[in-house]
């Protein structure tokens, strides 16, 4: 339904442009008219831009394991690609992108459901891409493109590892899992590498693409955006790299959880290992990614200042995690998303509208009932058309004088009208 809404909004905007005789892509967003906003809204729905972001956390976790990997890795990237082609350099999107990056990690920090947690990180990572393309310029667009590519690698690996854990244990709540590194060592190792990559650890691919985004924000003067995106990186570290690794894989093992690496299909193991290796290789050799970007930006992520800055931030975050580890433990509770802001009032709005429509329907039905009842009376008793007093009985119609006066007036009116016509004709002659 959400994609249908986005597709129809996009189609409506394109139809308006076509009716104006404009078929070039650049003309689709040339001016901020109705078509511009329809196209932007249509793409925003598919890219999970607020307030159209809650559907990801509701839909993705309920799909199949393989479906989640494909959708989490590719679906929202199509929306990002459209935004790069149509709305690159639109400053309005910068605010939405930064909000998505921060909001996603905040929700992931308190989320207990394994799959919903990664759904929120999809929103957060897409926020980085949208913020980068909104900054525009060669570095901004290349940063968004590189991060989209890298996101496919580490996000796909993370989702495969999560699916392996759920398939092996039959549980998807983090609070129900612990110490799986001994039982699923390959899965745990691949997850650790991918979780460090998504946080932006140096020497991994997430670091090289985030470096472009941060440089684009700094060079464009958006220092506030750079700061908030750095905070989002720290939140990613705490919610995935530390929280999930500790409570699911490397914490105290419990004997009541049955899981065995031998039960994991060989094809899935190979896919996880290849994904983890890809995160390492593209992180050690960033030119492999930079050369594929639209402008081929020559980035230099491994400067001493840049690497030191990330290490200091992550070290401080790790210390804070250890200090508040009891508060970081996931709890069994419902996570309220942004959709609750409009679901509650929308419920009462629909209820009030339904009552209003039902009232109009009942009144219209009653009025139609009275109307047809009167019509039925007139059809059975045509004399009611010339008098409001129906005869007392059909036997006394000839003796009752109730109809005499109206009939006499009609005859008199007929004679007067006839006389007027005759006089008019004689005068004309």
Regions found by a protein language model. Give the residues of each.
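Hard-cation-handling environments
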Residues: 262-316
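Hydrophobic transmembrane alpha-helices and their helix-loop junctions in integral membrane proteins
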Residues: 1-263, 284
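Hydrophobic alpha-helical transmembrane segments
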Residues: 40-43, 226-234, 303-322
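Aromatic-capped, Gly/Pro-kinked transmembrane alpha-helices
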Residues: 291, 295-304, 326-429
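Juxtamembrane/interfacial segments flanking transmembrane helices
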Residues: 48-54, 173, 203-204, 208-210, ...
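Hydrophobic core of alpha-helical transmembrane segments in multi-pass integral membrane proteins
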Residues: 11-14, 102, 274-281, 312-324, ...
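Alpha-helical transmembrane segments of multi-pass membrane proteins
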Residues: 198-201, 280-287, 323, 421-429
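Hydrophobic alpha-helical membrane-embedded segments
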Residues: 155, 235-239, 316-333
């Amino acid at each position: 339904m959400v994609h249908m809404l986005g597709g129809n909004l996009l189609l409506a905007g394109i139809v308006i442009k076509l009716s104006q005789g404009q078929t070039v892509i650049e003309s689709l967003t040339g001016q901020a008219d109705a078509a511009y906003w329809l196209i932007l809204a249509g793409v925003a729905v598919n890219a999970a831009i607020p307030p159209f972001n809650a559907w990801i956390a509701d839909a993705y976790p309920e799909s199949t394991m393989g479906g989640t990997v494909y959708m989490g890795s590719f679906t929202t990237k199509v929306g990002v690609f459209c935004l790069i082609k149509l709305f690159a350099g639109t400053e309005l999107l910068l605010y939405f992108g930064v909000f998505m990056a921060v909001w996603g990690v905040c929700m992931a920090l308190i989320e207990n459901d394994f799959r919903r947690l990664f759904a929120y990180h999809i929103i957060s990572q897409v926020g980085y891409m949208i913020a980068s393309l909104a900054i525009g310029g060669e570095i901004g667009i290349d940063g968004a493109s590189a991060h989209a590519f890298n996101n496919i690698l580490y996000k796909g690996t993370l989702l495969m590892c999560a699916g392996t854990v759920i398939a092996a244990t039959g549980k998807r709540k983090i609070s129900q899992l612990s110490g799986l590194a001994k039982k699923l060592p390959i899965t745990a190792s691949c997850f650790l590498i991918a979780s460090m990559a998504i946080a932006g650890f140096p020497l991994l691919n997430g670091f090289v693409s985030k470096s472009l985004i941060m440089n684009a924000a700094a060079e464009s003067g958006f220092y506030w955006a750079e700061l908030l995106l750095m905070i989002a990186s720290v939140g990613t570290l705490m919610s995935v790299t530390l929280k999930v690794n500790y409570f699911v894989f490397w914490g105290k093992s419990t004997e009541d959880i049955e899981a065995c690496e031998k039960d994991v299909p060989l094809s899935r193991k190979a896919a996880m290992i290849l994904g983890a290796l890809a995160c390492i290789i593209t992180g050690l050799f960033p030119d492999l990614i930079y050369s594929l970007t639209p402008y081929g930006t020559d980035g230099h992520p491994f400067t001493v200042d840049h690497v030191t800055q990330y290490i200091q931030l992550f070290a401080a975050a790790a210390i804070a995690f250890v200090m508040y580890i009891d508060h970081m433990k996931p709890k069994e509770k419902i996570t309220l998303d942004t959709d609750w802001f409009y679901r509650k009032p929308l419920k009462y709005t629909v209820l009030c509208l339904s009552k209003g429509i039902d009232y109009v329907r009942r009144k219209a039905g009653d009025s139609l009932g009275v109307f047809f009842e009167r019509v039925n009376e007139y059809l059975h008793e045509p004399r009611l058309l010339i008098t409001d007093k129906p005869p007392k009985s059909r036997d006394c119609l000839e003796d009752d004088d109730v109809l005499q006066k109206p009939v006499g007036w009609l005859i008199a009116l007929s004679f007067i009208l006839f006389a007027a016509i005759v006089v008019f004709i004689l005068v004309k002659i």
